[in-house]
UniProtKB/Swiss-Prot annotation:
Probable non-functional open reading frame (ORF) of V region of the variable domain of immunoglobulin light chains. Non-functional ORF generally cannot participate in the synthesis of a productive immunoglobulin chain due to altered V-(D)-J or switch recombination and/or splicing site (at mRNA level) and/or conserved amino acid change (protein level). Immunoglobulins, also known as antibodies, are membrane-bound or secreted glycoproteins produced by B lymphocytes. This is Probable non-functional immunoglobulin lambda variable 2-33. Its main location: secreted. Residues 110-118 are annotated as: Complementarity-determining-3. The lineage of its organism: Eukaryota, Metazoa, Chordata, Craniata, Vertebrata. It comes from the Eukaryota. InterPro entries: Ig-like_dom, Ig-like_dom_sf, Ig-like_fold, Ig_sub, Ig_V-set, IgV_Light_Chain.
């Protein structure tokens, strides 16, 4: 039986002390098991383009947000190498390789760490 794994993304607006920017993500992306998908996060030259402080979070039902990537492409200890981050110009991306059912979740980008207010 063929099935598609749905990965939901959120629109995120950061509001903090050093930037007030609207970051744009697609409403959803999907892929089949084993495939790779990339979620984009588009900003401007004065936010994503200027800074390497892009963070990616995963939010599953009934759990708190989990930091997947910080400073564009760095994974915290314990985060699977299925997740990778990159940036080109005003767009940051999160790539999830080898899709599995356990990565079905909400994903969002931010210019802030979880210690800031979103």
């Amino acid at each position: 039986m063929a099935w598609a794994l749905l990965l939901l993304t959120l629109l995120t607006q950061g509001t903090g002390s050093w930037a007030q920017s609207a970051l744009t993500q697609p409403p959803f992306v999907s892929g089949a098991p084993g495939q790779s998908v990339t979620i984009s996060c588009t900003g401007t030259s004065s936010d994503v383009g200027d800074y390497d402080h892009v963070f990616w979070y995963q939010k599953r039902l009934s759990t708190t947000s989990r930091l997947l990537i910080y400073n564009v492409n760095t994974r915290p200890s314990g985060i699977s190498d299925l997740f990778s981050g990159s940036k080109s110009g005003n767009m940051a991306s999160l790539t999830i390789s080898g899709l599995k059912s356990e990565v079905e979740a909400n994903y969002h980008c931010s210019l802030y760490s979880s210690s800031y207010t979103f």
